[in-house]
Structures are given as C-alpha cells and as structure tokens.
C-alpha cells in the first residue's frame, strides 16, 4: 500500500484548501482503483468493491464504518448484494482534500 495509509486525517474547516490540479494528479496515482466523479459541481473519489454475497458486503461496510469513526471522516456508502460503492469527499469544503485520498487508501487496506 502507499504511504497514505500511514497518515492520519487532519481537521478540515470550511476554509481549508481543496487539492490543486497538480496534487490531484499525484494523489490519484496513489489510489489507482479509485475514480474522480463530479456530482452537483462537487469533485468526489469513488470506487465499487465486489463481494460474493450480501453478508460479505455488509461486513466490509461495518469495517469501513469503524474506520470512518476512528478518523472522524465519513464517506457515502451504498451497500447492495455483492457490492459496496464508497464515495469520499470533504463536505466542509465541498470538494477533495488530502484526507479523502488518505481514507481511500485506508479503505483499500480493509480488503487485506
């Protein structure tokens, strides 16, 4: 995994800077399975995880909930039969912050 998994999220206030285009290009390479989506003008990171059944998808969702509480940074989560869609963005700045990439990397690590 990347060095992002060793980092902790920092408190993100409404005046915190969003990632720049250069930072985005660098950080997205560190979480290659994630894509950037824009919804309602807000840039977000998103990944769909596949599972063999609903129970495994739910177990992953619960591990992700624990991680989100530990870091005090919370994603959008859609749990369905055989898949979980995870979306990270920083609500306070209405866009992407380094925290979102840290959490994307840590979310990937939950599969190990």
Curated annotation (Swiss-Prot):
Stretches assigned to coiled coil: none
Reaction equations catalysed: (4aS,6R)-4a-hydroxy-L-erythro-5,6,7,8-tetrahydrobiopterin = (6R)-L-erythro-6,7-dihydrobiopterin + H2O
One annotated GO biological process: tetrahydrobiopterin biosynthetic process
Protein name: Putative pterin-4-alpha-carbinolamine dehydratase
Pfam families from the UniProt entry: Pterin_4a (PF01329)
EC category: lyase
Lineage: Bacteria, Pseudomonadati, Pseudomonadota, Gammaproteobacteria, Alteromonadales
Transmembrane segments: none
SUPFAM superfamilies linked to this entry: PCD-like (SSF55248)
EC numbers: 4.2.1.96
């Amino acid at each position: 995994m990347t060095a992002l998994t060793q980092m902790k999220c920092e408190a993100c206030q409404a005046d915190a800077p969003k990632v720049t285009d250069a930072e985005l290009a660098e950080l997205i390479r560190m979480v290659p399975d994630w894509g950037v989506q824009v919804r309602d003008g807000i840039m977000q990171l998103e990944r769909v995880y596949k599972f063999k059944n609903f129970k495994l998808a739910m177990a992953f969702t619960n591990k992700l909930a624990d991680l989100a509480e530990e870091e005090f940074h919370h994603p959008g989560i859609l749990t369905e039969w055989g898949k979980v869609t995870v979306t990270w963005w920083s609500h306070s700045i209405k866009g992407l912050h380094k925290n979102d990439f840290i959490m994307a990397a840590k979310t990937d690590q939950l599969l190990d």
